[in-house]
Amino acid sequence: MGRKKIQITRIMDERNRQVTFTKRKFGLMKKAYELSVLCDCEIALIIFNSTNKLFQYASTDMDKVLLKYTEYNEPHESRTNSDIVETLRKKGLNGCDSPDPDADDSVGHSPESEDKYRKINEDIDLMISRQRLCAVPPPNFEMPVSIPVSSHNSLVYSNPVSSLGNPNLLPLAHPSLQRNSMSPGVTHRPPSAGNTGGLMGGDLTSGAGTSAGNGYGNPRNSPGLLVSPGNLNKNMQAKSPPPMNLGMNNRKPDLRVLIPPGSKNTMPSVSEDVDLLLNQRINNSQSAQSLATPVVSVATPTLPGQGMGGYPSAISTTYGTEYSLSSADLSSLSGFNTASALHLGSVTGWQQQHLHSMPPSALSQLGDRTTTPSRYPQHTRHEAGRSPVDSLSSCSSSYDGSDREDHRNEFHSPIGLTRPSPDERESPSVKRMRLSEGWAT
């Protein structure tokens, strides 16, 4: 609360005049003290009030200062009230209306000075806030995410959809992102969780779309995914496997073989034969339709409530499109015998001719081989009146009538666990030759 301007005239009220004298006298002495200390000078004040009462102030000693004053004979500056009033008028201040800021130091600044300082502080705060806003860079929301893939021609697909993202980033377009295609001369192997051959890392903006089941980008998936053309829809799809009886309406079940990562070291010949079979599948394919059927993993049985029938193989939660193998393709895998007791076999037309010429003992041995492991004894017995050939060929028949339930319960033949005999352990070259002959017929 500042002081208002007062008119510099004589105060008529005795009480007010006395209070004003007391305050301003102390203020004058305070200014004299400050001046003497700051400028190293000697000051002497001699004041007589209206009642002729003496008040004096001396910076050092009054007698000494007065002695100097009496002995000083040189010209010097001497001021009176008229001189001060004239000086104030020249500076643009009216002597009668001057604010007299030095009159009372116990009171703060005047209202004008306080308003000026307040405005300056507000301007400084506004300037600092603007500088802080300009100094903060716009966030890009980039998340480096790496996904192991096995494709050799991996690419980074980024789609910055954030409004605060970097506007210089543009979505990367690639033909393989629109539709997954495989050239006949290129061999791709199904990806596994333990494969890190195609591991790439990159900073991708949020909303980087992955591929859905039909090969088109899906911008609502998790942000910053590194995808590859050959394996776009093998790693990011549905979170749980669908029921097995949904995709088996009046058509043959198309199954795909996903080799687990644990068996890659023990069965190198199976991987090579799968590559050869995939090449033959691509070269001789007449249908470009991509069927999103469940991927069946050839792995150790896990839970008895999952899987197909009595063989609870681990079903992958992805739906790839480029490695779909029909039952006719699985029939070509009948000669795959590995040291880890994995056997893929089914009976088709060209195998039935050999089965008819085989003795009954061999047929019974083949039937025993394609049944469920002894872990689930309720599925080990055959139905009355059904031969092992019928049980084996049931996977390639259409699901009609009551056979649909039987086939779902006894769906063993495409992927069965068996221990190969010594005469069946052949070299990879012999297996490859037999696959070529079987495919040609």
Swiss-Prot record:
Segments for region (Beta domain):
271-278
**What GO molecular function annotation could you give as one example from this UniProt entry?**
RNA polymerase II cis-regulatory region sequence-specific DNA binding
Stretches of Basic and acidic residues bias are at: 401-411
Function text: Transcription activator which binds specifically to the MEF2 element present in the regulatory regions of many muscle-specific genes. Controls cardiac morphogenesis and myogenesis, and is also involved in vascular development. Enhances transcriptional activation mediated by SOX18. Plays an essential role in hippocampal-dependent learning and memory by suppressing the number of excitatory synapses and thus regulating basal and evoked synaptic transmission. Crucial for normal neuronal development, distribution, and electrical activity in the neocortex.
Its quaternary structure?
Forms a complex with class II HDACs in undifferentiating cells. On myogenic differentiation, HDACs are released into the cytoplasm allowing MEF2s to interact with other proteins for activation. Interacts with EP300 in differentiating cells; the interaction acetylates MEF2C leading to increased DNA binding and activation. Interacts with HDAC7 and CARM1. Interacts with HDAC4, HDAC7 and HDAC9; the interaction with HDACs represses transcriptional activity. Interacts with LPIN1. Interacts with MYOCD. Interacts with AKAP13.
Name the residue ranges with Polar residues bias: 362-377
Superkingdom of this protein's organism? Eukaryota
Q: What's this protein's family per the entry?
A: Belongs to the MEF2 family.
According to UniProt, the name of this protein is Myocyte-specific enhancer factor 2C
Q: How is it modified after translation?
A: Phosphorylation on Ser-59 enhances DNA binding activity.
Q: Does the keyword Mitochondrion apply?
A: no
Tell me where in this chain the PTM Phosphoserine is found: S59, S98, S106, S110, S222, S228, S240, S387, S413
